[in-house]
Swiss-Prot record:
Keywords: Endosome, Transport
GO cellular component terms listed in the entry, alphabetical order: BLOC-1 complex; endosome
Signal peptide (UniProt feature, chain positions): none
Principal localisation: other
Subcellular locations according to the entry: Endosome
Subunit: Component of the biogenesis of lysosome-related organelles complex-1 (BLOC-1).
Record-stated family: Belongs to the BLOC1S1 family.
Protein name: Biogenesis of lysosome-related organelles complex 1 subunit BLS1
Length: 106
């Protein structure tokens, strides 16, 4: 049996040893890989996803909005024109009624 000082020295060596065992090395590599994935690859993936979302969803919707905003403006003009036509028809109808009244009184 080793003397207690030798035993103490071995225990100190084991406890204070900072070199990694094979499982410790594997665990460190996994941690480093996880950090790389979160710091680098996840940012790239989010940027790619954002760009893909913009191209597939936002841009087509923006184009539709721009296209149909023009139609909406024209339909607003159509509403005004319809109101003017309706007013003109009422004036014509009233004029016809007045003409018919004048004919019947003569």
């Amino acid at each position: 049996m080793p003397p207690s000082t030798e035993l103490d020295a071995l225990v100190d060596k084991i406890v204070n040893d900072h070199s990694l065992s094979e499982p410790g090395q594997s665990l460190k590599e996994l941690g480093d890989n996880g950090k790389y994935i979160m710091d680098v690859q996840m940012k790239k993936l989010l940027k790619l996803h954002d760009q893909s979302f913009i191209e597939r969803c936002f841009t087509p919707m923006e184009e539709l909005k721009n296209r149909y905003a023009k139609v909406k403006e024209r339909s607003g003009d159509l509403q005004k024109e319809a109101e003017l036509v309706d007013r003109d028809i009422r004036i014509i109808e009233m004029a016809i009624q007045d003409i018919n009244k004048n004919k019947s009184h003569q």
